[in-house]
């Protein structure tokens, strides 16, 4: 008997992955790897996972054993990367998305399906995920052929695809058609069936949404009319009901708001404003039904394209595309944001993914 071992506390550093555009001048050569200090937010660089072109968005598998990347290019693709217990990474292979310019992907909570959004071609795709995390042949491709595109849009532009917190529906946000589509996913066939659609203001350019943890409200950033929209979601029917556009606190004109995130307790929402180079803070009230604008905070970088909270919502990471940096903030219990250290250099940083 070797004596009782004290239970291991949470590890002081956890992995952090970085998306980039490999095709841009000054861009990275693949998916960046790093580690972050779970207390201070300090980031330490690691090697690059090469062999993935334009990995502009990254999504984890619920098991923690795999991560997925889009290749945002003409012949769109999605790639699976295995994460070894020792922290090493191995590319498992890629599959075509059936469209062009995929900008977003997410894993269905069952862990069995990968959902991706082809921005340029305006379609959404489904791929099966095997036991080892690798991807099978695409099982569906749905093009947002109606309604007609909004003002100034040449066609549909699917920008995001996510599963509702209850797991019952898949929602796709289309910037070109100013529409959020609700689908049911056939969990055995991997096919999508549209059940409803929600119209946003013409020309608003809906881009990304984030659900409140209560599962009945979502917050949608519209990048062309510079608004945040509180949307009600009905888990029974999948109906998605947008409210009026609300201020981002960034003044007149558009600041191309990019992505909202919601703290784990559902108390605060943060929004990245690319043109304004700021983070808007909102307090969540009314059980998720109301956003109260608090203020805007400088992001400390240029063109914040994507935000991510650490798993415990104690840290906020911002990927700043034009300054090629990641800035980190400590998140207070009162929703305050406090800069944590110097910006971390990351070439053409367009996505940051802190892993649990």
State the predicted function of each range.
Residues 34-41, 80-87, 126-136, 183-191, ...:
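Short loop/turn segments immediately following beta-strands, especially the blade-tip
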Residues 44-111:
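Blade-loop segments of beta-propeller domains
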Residues 44-50, 90-96, 139-140, 146-152, ...:
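A short beta-strand motif characteristic of beta-propeller blades
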Residues 88-160:
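Asp-box/WD-like beta-propeller blade repeats and closely related beta-sheet repeat scaffolds
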Residues 322-327, 334, 338-356:
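Blade-level signature of beta-propeller repeat domains, shared across WD40, Kelch, NHL, RCC1
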């Amino acid at each position: 008997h070797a004596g009782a071992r004290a239970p291991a506390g949470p590890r002081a550093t956890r992995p952090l992955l970085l998306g980039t555009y490999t095709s841009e001048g000054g861009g990275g050569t693949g998916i960046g790897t790093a580690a972050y200090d779970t207390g201070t937010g300090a980031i330490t660089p690691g090697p690059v996972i090469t062999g993935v072109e334009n990995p502009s968005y990254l999504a984890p598998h619920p098991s923690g054993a795999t991560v997925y990347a889009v290749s945002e290019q003409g012949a769109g693709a999605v790639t699976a990367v295995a994460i070894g217990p020792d922290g090493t990474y191995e590319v498992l292979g890629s599959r075509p998305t059936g469209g062009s310019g995929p900008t977003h992907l997410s894993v269905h909570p069952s862990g069995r399906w990968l959902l991706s959004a082809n921005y340029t071609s305006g379609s959404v795709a489904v791929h099966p995920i095997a036991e080892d995390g690798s991807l099978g042949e695409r099982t569906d491709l749905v093009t947002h052929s109606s309604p007609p595109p909004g003002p100034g849009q040449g066609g549909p532009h699917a920008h995001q695809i996510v599963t509702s917190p209850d797991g019952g529906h898949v929602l796709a946000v289309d910037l070109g058609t100013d529409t959020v589509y609700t689908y049911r996913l056939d969990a055995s066939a991997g096919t999508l069936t549209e059940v409803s659609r929600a119209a946003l203001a013409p020309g608003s350019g809906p881009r990304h949404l984030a659900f409140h943890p209560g599962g009945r409200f979502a917050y949608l950033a519209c990048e062309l009319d510079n608004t945040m929209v509180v949307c009600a979601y009905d888990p029974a029917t999948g109906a998605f009901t947008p409210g009026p556009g609300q201020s981002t606190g960034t003044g007149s004109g558009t600041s191309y708001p990019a992505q909202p995130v919601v703290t784990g307790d559902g108390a605060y929402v943060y929004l990245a404003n690319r043109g304004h180079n700021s983070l808007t803070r909102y307090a969540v009230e009314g059980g998720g039904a109301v956003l109260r604008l608090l203020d805007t905070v400088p992001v400390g970088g240029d063109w914040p394209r994507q935000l991510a909270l650490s798993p415990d919502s104690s840290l906020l990471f911002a990927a700043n595309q034009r300054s090629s940096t990641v800035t980190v903030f400590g998140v207070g219990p009162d929703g305050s944001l406090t800069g944590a250290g110097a910006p971390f250099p990351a070439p053409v940083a367009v996505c940051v993914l802190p892993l649990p």
